[in-house]
């Protein structure tokens, strides 16, 4: 801003011009009177108007810089103690205190444009490519879309040497060797990159902060997830094992092969250290943890996998398995002790290692997990009341020649009581049968299974009971797996429950009939059914034994009596 009128001064000083000013230019009192910016009344008196003059030394020095940079210059105003001098100093404001060099240019950046990228490359993977590069300002990826037939990326550097070094390194890899790379000098878009603490984590453009060689960054990256909170002294203690890292690296489905990045080995060294040798290793974060999306689950995610999460991934057993011992009377988990050291201990271990255990959810609804592989530990389930069935329970149709039966996948909890676990045999006990069950319907259902031999059905006061015999044990195991949880046409309290019988059909156990009867009565009070013998249903002559306790699943609570 300058003071003066074009009518009073022949050649006014233009701020946007590059014209040099002479040795000394003074604004006289007559010139100031013609100015529309300064009232004429303030000039009356003995004010020393000649105190305001241009500084030739400052002008010459600034004019020389303006010619070299192509930028406008400003003249400084000498301070004065007179009223007009103070007024003009205020009017000129920042011009008197302007720095010698005033520029409107941006810092120079160099962009590495990479074309013909893999079509399935994600912004996260493209960013991790330059994770250990130096002088990186921003990384952008334009994936394949309707407008872009070929994916291309852009990495902005603050120096050309860093861009050239990154280009040479990428061309030597197997993934980027087929890509075309161009270095763009004086990249102006780099001035608009986000260098503040708030970075944008979008899928099309990912910007991250400048990586320093002397400190570990703690700013948010990729959707405000704090990935670099831990210092470098936690590398050895928090580094996951080689097997776990390689597994997470494979699950990330990254197209970046082993030539670019590898999971850390037991020694904790990274192959990327050789790739970007100029960047110091000050991050405990491994590439496998960055790319494994299941690892980043919360904003406060830590790159160190917890012991519990590692065990869950290795064993595949969720903590909800403890609900398997729910009681039908109290709905409270009861502790059980194994009194058998032989087969029961083996079945407990096999139950703990089952990758898809049949669980009973805490909200009394059915779980939708797939049925587990057939093991003795999952062959018998606890009963449940009708109130535990959710109205929105998904059912799957099971077709047969007789009609369509509904099947509940993983609908019943696993019974882990050692007293209810019988070894596999060729006879299956059918439990949870409604009072109006038809023998013909059961025959039609089980006759569809391979190896079906015969069926023994008996109706007692507490409900029907049924045993199905197959040609051999494998056929019985296959039928148990296929028909477990199938709903009959008259089912009201869930599907049928299948389990192995204590002894084959028609074969009497070594114990006497009286002892078996007493044991069956005790099992009724404990809610167990697997200890019922088929010899109590059939005598030696093949007829039914009249002295027999009903093999219902519990007591009168089963049918609401």
Curated annotation (Swiss-Prot):
Specify the domain of life of the species encoding this protein: Eukaryota
Q: Where is the composition biased (Low complexity)?
A: 298-310, 390-401
**Mostly located where?**
cytoplasm
Q: Name one GO cellular component term.
A: cytoplasm
Keywords per UniProt = Cytoplasm, Phosphoprotein, RNA-binding
Modified positions (Phosphothreonine) are 193, 218
Q: Please give the Gene3D superfamilies that the UniProt record associates with this protein.
A: 3.30.70.330
Q: Which SMART domains match?
A: RRM
**Where is this protein localized, as stated in its record?**
Cytoplasm
Pfam families hit by this protein: RRM_1 (PF00076)
Which residue range or ranges hold the RRM domain?
A: 426-503
Please provide, alphabetically and separated by semicolons, the GO molecular function terms listed in this UniProt record: mRNA binding
Which Gene Ontology BP annotations are present?
mRNA processing
Instruction: Give the function comment from the record.
Output: Acts as a negative regulator of cell wall and septum deposition.
Family annotation (PANTHER family) = U1 SMALL NUCLEAR RIBONUCLEOPROTEIN A/U2 SMALL NUCLEAR RIBONUCLEOPROTEIN B
Stated name of the protein: Cell wall integrity protein scw1
Identify the species of origin: Schizosaccharomyces pombe (strain 972 / ATCC 24843) (Fission yeast)
């Amino acid at each position: 801003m300058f003071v003066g009128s074009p009518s009073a001064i022949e050649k006014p000083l233009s701020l946007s011009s590059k014209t040099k000013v002479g040795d000394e230019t003074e604004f006289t009192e007559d010139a100031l009177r013609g100015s529309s910016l300064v009232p004429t009344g303030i000039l009356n008196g003995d004010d020393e108007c000649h105190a305001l003059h241009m500084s030739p030394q400052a002008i010459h020095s600034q004019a020389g810089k303006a010619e070299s940079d192509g930028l406008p210059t400003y003249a400084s105003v000498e301070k004065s103690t007179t009223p007009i001098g103070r007024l003009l100093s205020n009017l000129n404001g920042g011009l008197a205190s302007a720095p010698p060099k005033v520029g409107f240019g941006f810092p120079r950046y160099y962009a590495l444009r990479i074309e013909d990228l893999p079509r399935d490359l994600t912004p996260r993977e493209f960013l991790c490519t330059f994770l250990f590069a130096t002088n990186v300002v921003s990384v952008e990826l334009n994936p394949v879309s309707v407008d872009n037939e070929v994916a291309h990326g852009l990495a902005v550097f603050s120096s050309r040497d860093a861009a050239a070094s990154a280009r040479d390194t990428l061309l030597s890899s197997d993934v980027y060797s087929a890509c075309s790379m161009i270095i763009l000098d004086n990249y102006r878009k780099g001035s608009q990159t986000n260098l503040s603490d708030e970075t944008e984590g979008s899928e099309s453009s990912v910007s991250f902060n400048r990586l320093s060689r002397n400190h570990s960054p703690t700013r948010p990256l990729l959707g405000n997830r704090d990935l670099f909170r831990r210092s470098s002294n936690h590398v050895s203690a928090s580094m996951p094992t080689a097997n776990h890292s390689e597994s997470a690296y494979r699950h990330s489905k990254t197209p970046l092969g082993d030539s670019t990045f590898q999971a850390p080995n037991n020694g904790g060294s990274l192959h990327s250290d050789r790739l970007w040798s100029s960047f110091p290793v000050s991050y405990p974060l491994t590439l496998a943890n960055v790319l494994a999306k299941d690892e980043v689950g919360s904003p406060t995610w830590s790159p160190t996998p917890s012991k519990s999460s590692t065990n869950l991934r290795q064993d595949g057993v969720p903590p909800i398995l403890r609900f398997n011992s729910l009681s039908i009377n109290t709905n409270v988990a009861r502790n059980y002790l194994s009194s058998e050291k032989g087969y029961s201990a083996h079945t407990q271990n096999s139950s703990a290692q089952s990758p898809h255990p049949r669980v009973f959810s805490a909200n009394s609804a059915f779980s939708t997990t797939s049925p587990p592989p057939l093991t003795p530990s999952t062959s018998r389930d606890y009963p449940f009341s009708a109130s535990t069935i959710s109205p929105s329970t998904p059912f799957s149709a099971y077709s047969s020649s007789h009609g369509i039966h509904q099947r509940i996948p993983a609908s019943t909890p696993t019974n882990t009581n050692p007293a209810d676990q019988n070894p596999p045999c060729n006879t299956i006990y059918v439990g949870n049968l409604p009072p109006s069950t038809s023998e013909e319907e059961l025959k039609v259902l089980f006759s569809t299974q391979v190896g079906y031999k015969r069926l023994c059905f008996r109706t007692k006061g507490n409900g029907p009971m049924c045993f199905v015999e197959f040609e051999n044990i494998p056929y019985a195991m296959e039928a148990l797996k296929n028909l477990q949880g199938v709903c009959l046409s008259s089912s009201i309290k869930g599907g049928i429950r299948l389990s192995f019988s204590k002894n084959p059909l028609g074969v009497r156990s070594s114990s006497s009939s009286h002892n078996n009867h007493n044991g069956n009565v005790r099992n009724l009070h404990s809610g167990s059914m697997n200890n019922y013998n088929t010899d109590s249903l059939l005598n030696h002559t093949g007829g039914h034994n009249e002295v027999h306790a009903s093999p219902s699943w519990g007591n009168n609570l089963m049918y609401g009596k």
